[in-house]
Amino acid sequence: MPVFIVFLLCMFTYTCFAEDSSESGVTEQAQAVFSELLSSLEEETKEALSEIGIDDADYTQLLSLSPKRVVDAILELITGKMSEKLKAVGFVCALLVLSAVLDGFAQPGSTMHSVFSVFTTLLIVVSLLLPVSESLVQAFSAMELSSNFLLAYIPAFAGVISMSGKPLSSAAYSSAMIGLSNLLAQCNVKVFLPVVQVFFSLNIASSVQPKYAFNSLVAFFKKAVTVLLGFSATIFTGLLAIKGSLASAGDSVAVRGVKMLVGSAVPVVGSALSDAYTSVLGSITLIQSAVGIFGIVVFALMHVPVILDLLLWYLALSFTASVSEALGQKQAATLLNGIASTVSLVNTLVIFTAFILIISTGIMLNFKN
């Protein structure tokens, strides 16, 4: 009787096969991470991503990113922002030529000569204050947007790093970047913005009232800020590289230990399980690289348009300052050089922020088990 029951069970059994769902599981995890990151972006950044061919939460689009589309988008951006600067240059040059002609009818050092110089300087301030201020506001908005995006990006990227078998590297990255995010958010409002306002005011005051020569003070101030930012960037990236290197070494030892333990402790199928573990880690490492590259692209799209806009303003203001000096308009030249110096300082702040965010992500992508 027991033999007959066993025979019946064998007759009515079905053959089953294990489903290889590793690839689909990795794809679903990647889609979930990208969807979360995309939902935290502003509409302008999403449109910029769409212009370069990244319009869906699919890491395969990052692999097919076309350099030609990126270059075309940058050229289109420069062309669109060029018209405003050319109009400003034309208007300021016309004022300078008119002021130079009127100065020809006034005696050097006379009251009329001083009136013409002050009047020209004030007209330049009025004509440039609004467009330049809008560009400066956009620069601070870009830095604020990048700080807000970090709040969603840090947990996602750190989580993927931890899933890929590098929990120590994940902890090192998240601790450093959370501190950086809070520091940038506080500095944008309490340090950077007041510094730029004071810097801008001193430049205008030194041009309207030549007896208050703040040029040397402003130049020293700018140089000090630039050196401080460069020193801070070097220290931060160096510390992150050191912490990441040590954490990566510890993670590598842990992964090898797990593989050795599984291969030796589990009989018969130990080596197969060890290979499967390695395959899973490799798949998750692919997600880590995709998320890291996506973050670098987003940070670049947030900052590159602002950097190019400020660079165009700097070139336009420097050109008009050269024209002003050639026409003998010293006060106007001082004003234009001062505004150009302010724009250059803000651009330095934006480049510093972009450099820190992009390089820190690149450092973590460089460490492999």
Label each region the model flagged.
Residues P2-I5, L9-L95, A100-S117, L130-S141, ...:
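Gly/Ser-rich, low-complexity
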Residues L327-N347:
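Interfacial loop-to-transmembrane junctions
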Residues S289-K330:
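Helical hairpin unit composed of two closely spaced alpha helices linked by a short loop
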Residues A176-G238:
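Loop-centered beta-sheet repeat module
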Residues L122-P131, L150-P167, C187-V195, I204:
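Mid-bilayer segments of alpha-helical transmembrane spans in multi-pass integral membrane proteins
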Residues V115-V126, S146-I154, L183-V189, F220-T234, ...:
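Small-residue-enriched core segments of transmembrane alpha-helices in multipass membrane transport
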Residues V89, C93-V97, L123, S127, ...:
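Residue-level signal for the membrane-embedded core of alpha-helical transmembrane segments
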Residues L98, L102, S201, A205, ...:
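Alpha-helical membrane-inserting segments
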